[in-house]
A protein has these predicted regions:
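Catalytic cores and motor modules of nucleic-acid processing enzymes
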Residues: 1-256, 261-269, 278, 282-288, ...
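Catalytic core segments in nucleotide and nucleic-acid processing enzymes
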Residues: 275
């Protein structure tokens, strides 16, 4: 597949300066080496999850909204399994029929097994802790909720997984700011722009692009922003950052800015073009992390 992908190189006008650019990222001090008293590596979520335990965490989950959750949840279209079976947690109708014929106590154990299986691929959570945590959740369910869970253990697994992820994110945020205060985390030049990129959908009609072609825009608003920026005399080049592949502000939550803009005065601007209509808790947390990055990067 890689050989068939088109590669777009840095524009020759900007290639030298872009190749020498190192963008600050959060770095974690990991100890000493033979050659230095300070050894650092790029901070990862896995670093921040160290020491996390579910044993002391709350089990407050809104299961009353299961019906609306089923109505709105999106399953990956590439999965051949029908959506209804994915939500129920069964592979097919025969398995569901067999499940319905089981006695109530066995159904409960099977539901728990389905939930544990769906959550057990999270390496940040201890399997034994997870088993105990799911037991605590099930013990607090009402009779109606237990009946619902028997019908759709898949959706209960999704809601529990969402809760576990929110607990992990809270813990990671707490550890991040603690380690910043303890000077375990710094913000140092680290990320280098690649010499070429390989977006699947590109645009080449806007001047001052860093690469010969850039990844195309998600919205018309984003395109207008870039058109305006490229027309400014003090803008040297712009680049559309490729989400999950390009530069990220690697804090307690990873933030991929939509655009990078280099000014003629040498400043590098990281720009998020999402409109107010998309503002939510996650985008606010990303904005906070971006502000902390800017403060520490200097």
């Amino acid at each position: 597949v890689g050989d068939k992908m088109k590669h777009y190189k840095l524009n020759q006008l900007f290639a030298d300066e872009a190749s020498s650019l190192e963008i600050p990222q959060f770095m974690l001090e990991t100890g000493r080496s033979l050659f230095s008293e300070h050894v650092q590596q790029p901070l990862s979520k896995e670093n921040l999850y160290a020491g996390f335990s579910l044993l002391d965490k709350d089990t407050v989950i809104d299961f009353d909204s299961v019906d609306s959750e089923i109505a709105r949840i999106d399953i990956d279209d590439s999965d051949a399994m029908p959506k209804a079976w994915k939500l129920q947690g069964f592979d097919n109708q025969n398995v569901k029929k067999w499940f319905d014929e089981q006695p109530s106590d066995r159904k409960m154990r099977l539901c728990k097994d389905i939930i544990i299986k769906k959550l057990s691929n999270n390496n940040a959570v201890n399997d034994r802790d997870l088993d105990i945590y799911v037991d605590r959740i099930i013990q607090n369910l009402t009779e109606d909720q237990l009946t619902d869970m028997e019908q759709t253990p898949g959706i209960y697994a999704l809601k529990i997984n969402k809760k576990v992820n929110s607990l992990l994110n809270e813990y990671a945020k707490k550890m991040f700011y603690e380690w910043v205060e303890q000077d375990k985390i710094s913000c140092l030049p680290s990320y280098k722009l690649p010499r070429e990129i390989s977006p699947t959908n590109t645009i080449a009609s806007i001047p001052k692009s860093l690469y010969s072609e850039e990844e195309n825009f998600d919205t018309e608003y984003e395109r207008k922003v870039v058109m305006e920026l490229s027309s400014l005399n003090n803008v040297r080049w712009w680049h559309r950052n490729i989400a999950r592949k390009g530069f990220s502000i690697n804090g307690a939550i990873n933030a991929y800015p939509d655009l990078m803009v280099k000014t003629e005065s040498g400043k590098l601007l990281l720009i998020e073009t999402k409109g107010d209509q998309l503002e939510n808790l996650e985008s606010k947390e990303k904005a906070e992390m971006g502000a902390k990055w800017a403060e520490m990067a200097g």
